[in-house]
């Protein structure tokens, strides 16, 4: 760049910063403009790895969708528990009016510190969400679910009235406001969504999600969760075999997937994943039905090995750290990197 252009650019940047504030515009390579983001674990080690950054990104819009009883709310409650363990403040916008606090506690959620709202209509739910995001004090907000964000006009109208596109317009307008505020506040907004069928589709999948197309565009991460089988103890079904596909990912390569077990009343079988992935990278030895770590045998069969790791959490954490270092290139399981200092200061201030 010649001197005249460089001077003109410098003057323009100075004018922009004077008018709109420091760090409004910067070079992408600057240390202060780092793109590394804080992450929150999903509760599933395999899914954290499939996401490519070690968890769900803060400051972004995230969508998780799937059929009924596939584990959507379970996954989000586990993410809330992980966020709280990092010292974060979380909120749950329960538009379906179906949150079970007893089950949430079983999954590790501190219900005393969890903010809960059960709004009357979609406008109220999204306005509450935006106000919480702009406060700068919330780390994670879950909206359960998009399908239950019923527009006020539909609630006040008659049962047979037609309200074409109302919910889609509501979501589009709300996301335009929330997305920028979420980035500035470093607050993750996680939408749970349901599946509907499109009529008359001859080719391709007839499935679609509710609430229009806006959420598909604004979401940095979209996950499709499905129940693919049952986990049995003898003849008794004790859980679901679950598969999650990362359909969209702006943080890492998309289309990866993870399979894991969700045990009823307990959540993801995290230690079973630690053993499987430990064997995959060579951190855990397997000879016949015996599993070993270093020179120590940890159990015969996966069930006994899980019990051993449950009784020896330090060994489980050590194996998990090795898995994350191998798969993600990081030894810290709580975050990939910190947000730059300027952004932290900005996130601490309420967004006007």
UniProtKB/Swiss-Prot annotation:
Protein name, UniProt field: Protein RecA
Keyword Amino-acid biosynthesis: no
Region Disordered: start-end pairs: 330-352
Pfam families referenced in this protein's UniProt entry, alphabetically: RecA, RecA_C
Family designation: Belongs to the RecA family.
Gene Ontology cellular-component annotations: cytosol
PANTHER family found in the cross-reference section: MITOCHONDRIAL DNA REPAIR PROTEIN RECA HOMOLOG-RELATED, RECA
Organism: Psychrobacter cryohalolentis (strain ATCC BAA-1226 / DSM 17306 / VKM B-2378 / K5)
Listed SUPFAM superfamilies: P-loop containing nucleoside triphosphate hydrolases, RecA protein, C-terminal domain
Role this protein plays: Can catalyze the hydrolysis of ATP in the presence of single-stranded DNA, the ATP-dependent uptake of single-stranded DNA by duplex DNA, and the ATP-dependent hybridization of homologous single-stranded DNAs. It interacts with LexA causing its activation and leading to its autocatalytic cleavage.
Family annotation (HAMAP family): RecA
Compartment annotation: Cytoplasm
Molecular function terms from GO: ATP binding; ATP hydrolysis activity; ATP-dependent DNA damage sensor activity; damaged DNA binding; single-stranded DNA binding
InterPro entries xrefs: AAA+_ATPase, DNA_recomb/repair_RecA, DNA_recomb/repair_RecA_CS, P-loop_NTPase, RecA-like_C, RecA-like_N, RecA_ATP-bd, RecA_C_sf
Biological process (GO), any one: SOS response
Keywords: ATP-binding, Cytoplasm, DNA damage, DNA recombination, DNA repair, DNA-binding, Nucleotide-binding, SOS response
Source organism, top-level taxon: Bacteria
Binding site for ATP: 66-73
């Amino acid at each position: 760049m010649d001197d005249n252009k460089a001077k003109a650019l410098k003057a323009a940047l100075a004018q922009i910063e004077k008018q709109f504030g420091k760090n409004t515009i910067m070079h992408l390579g600057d240390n202060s403009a780092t793109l590394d983001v804080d992450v929150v674990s999903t509760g599933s080690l395999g899914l954290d790895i499939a996401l490519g950054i070690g968890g769900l990104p803060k400051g972004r819009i995230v969508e998780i969708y799937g059929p009924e009883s596939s584990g959507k709310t379970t996954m989000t409650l586990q993410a809330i528990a992980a966020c709280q363990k990092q010292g974060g403040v979380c909120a749950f916008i329960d538009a379906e009016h179906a949150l079970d606090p007893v089950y949430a506690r079983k999954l590790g959620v501190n219900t005393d510190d969890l903010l809960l709202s059960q709004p009357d209509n979609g406008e109220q739910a999204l306005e509450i969400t935006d106000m919480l995001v702009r406060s700068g004090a919330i780390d994670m907000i879950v909206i359960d679910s998009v399908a239950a964000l019923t527009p006020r006009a539909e609630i006040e109208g008659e049962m047979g009235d037609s309200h074409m596109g109302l919910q889609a317009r509501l979501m589009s307008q709300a996301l335009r406001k929330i997305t920028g505020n979420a980035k500035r506040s470093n607050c993750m907004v996680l939408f749970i969504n349901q599946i509907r069928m499109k009529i008359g589709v001859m080719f391709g999948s007839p499935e679609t999600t509710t609430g229009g197309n806006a959420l598909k565009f604004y979401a940095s991460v979209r996950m499709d969760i499905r129940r693919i089988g049952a986990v049995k103890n003898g003849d008794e079904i004790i859980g679901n075999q679950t598969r999650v596909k990362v359909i969209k990912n702006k943080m890492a390569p998309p289309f990866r997937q993870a399979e894991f077990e969700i045990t009823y009343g307990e959540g993801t079988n995290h230690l079973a994943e630690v053993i499987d992935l430990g064997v995959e990278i060579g951190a855990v030895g397997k000879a016949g039905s015996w599993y070993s770590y270093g020179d120590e045998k940890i159990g015969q069969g996966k069930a006994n090995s899980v019990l051993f790791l449950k009784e020896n959490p330090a060994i489980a954490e050590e194996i998990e750290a090795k898995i994350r270092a191998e798969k993600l290139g990081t030894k810290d399981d709580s975050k990939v990197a910190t947000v730059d200092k300027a952004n932290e200061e900005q996130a601490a201030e309420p967004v006007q």
